[in-house]
Amino acid sequence: MKKTAIAIAVALAGFATVAQAAPKDNTWYTGAKLGWSQYHDTGFINNNGPTHENQLGAGAFGGYQVNPYVGFEMGYDWLGRMPYKGSVENGAYKAQGVQLTAKLGYPITDDLDIYTRLGGMVWRADTKSNVYGKNHDTGVSPVFAGGVEYAITPEIATRLEYQWTNNIGDAHTIGTRPDNGMLSLGVSYRFGQGEAAPVVAPAPAPAPEVQTKHFTLKSDVLFNFNKATLKPEGQAALDQLYSQLSNLDPKDGSVVVLGYTDRIGSDAYNQGLSERRAQSVVDYLISKGIPADKISARGMGESNPVTGNTCDNVKQRAALIDCLAPDRRVEIEVKGIKDVVTQPQA
């Protein structure tokens, strides 16, 4: 039995890689175990009777899972009380100890691991006999364990384990120096295994806001009648307009300058005049800093009059020129996409 136990422990020691059924990284666990404890190599002075080597064993343990590969475990073991009888001496031996081991594992399935524990035990062994009375001894012995662990839930796991402890006692002090093998069934509770909070997908970015701005300037302010050269007053008006355009700062913006005339004169002449006036405005705004590829001119001639038929009965030329003044205009259309800024959620 001893050789079999050692062979199992040595074989399991090779499986020292990631255990998927292990607790989450950097978490604690605690548990308890109960099982069959058997003492080996029990030699007692003056004892020629039966020795009850098989006893009930139990223990409690706690551990810390560093990462999927390695954990550390500390526990208390009650290895059992072993009575013995002989023709001269009758008594009992009992042992208990505190152990510290490194726990290494290997995944079989998502929920099942093979593991091994390697470390040492600080033990105390006591004897009581009708001949020598009470004696005790303390010491440190190596501990080897191997087993399988099954995760019932993320928090609760069960394990089946065989543990071997070498040389518990001093034959000169308590009359024996046995080894111990314990087969146990344990249950553990793992802390901090709750499901991670679901990741809430960020709200989709709001659709960009497309904005269009319109500005209208009177041609009589910009130009002399029947001319396409900007007046100083016209330049001053465009300076103010440029400041407004700069404040808009649209993303991917474009500026269209539309020139209009009144109905006095031929269609062809008015079309050409409206184009020249629109281009004069464009050239000036480019000189102020608007990119040339973002602004264009378009002559609209005498189309889209704003006066309608209000001037139809005006016959004198000077009066008609004054009446049709609203038709002589320059319209500036700014199109662009404005970035929508949302406030972060609290």
Swiss-Prot record:
Spans within the Extracellular topological domain: 38-54, 79-95, 121-141, 165-181
Annotated spans, 4 X 2 AA tandem repeats of A-P: 201-208
Any GO BP annotation: monoatomic ion transport
Keyword Cell membrane: no
Effect seen on changing residue 89 to G: Becomes partially sensitive to phages K3h1, M1. Increased resistance to colicin K
Effect of residue 338 to A: Still dimerizes
Effect of residue 129 to F: Becomes sensitive to phages K3, K4, K5, K3h1, TuII*-26, Ox2, Ox4, Ox5, Ox2h5, Ox2h20, partially sensitive to phages TuII*-46, M1
Domain OmpA-like: 210-338
Effect of residue 86 to R: Becomes sensitive to phages K3h1, partially sensitive to phages K4, K5, M1. Increased resistance to colicin K
Effect of residue 114 to V: In strain: K1 / E44
Effect of residue 311 to G: Protein insertion into vesicles is not blocked by ferricyanide
TM regions (residue ranges): 27-37, 55-66, 70-78, 96-107, 112-120, 142-151, 156-164, 182-191
Chain positions covered by the region annotation Hinge-like: 197-208
GO molecular function, one term: monoatomic ion transmembrane transporter activity
Site, Part of salt bridge gating mechanism: residue positions: 73, 159
Locations listed in the record: Cell outer membrane
Family membership: Belongs to the outer membrane OOP (TC 1.B.6) superfamily. OmpA family.
Physiological role: With TolR probably plays a role in maintaining the position of the peptidoglycan cell wall in the periplasm. Plays a role in resistance to environmental stress, and a role in outer membrane functionality and cell shape. Non-covalently binds peptidoglycan. Acts as a porin with low permeability that allows slow penetration of small solutes. A very abundant protein, there can be up to 210,000 OmpA molecules per cell.
Domains as described in the record: The N-terminus transmembrane region forms low conductance pores (50-80 pS); larger conductance pores (260-320 pS) are formed by the whole protein. Refolding of the periplasmic domain may be required to make the large conductance pores. The structure of the whole protein is controversial; the periplasmic domain may or may not be inserted into the cell outer membrane to form a larger pore. The protein with a narrow 8 sheet beta-barrel and a periplasmic domain may be an intermediate in formation of the larger pore.
Protein name, UniProt field: Outer membrane protein A
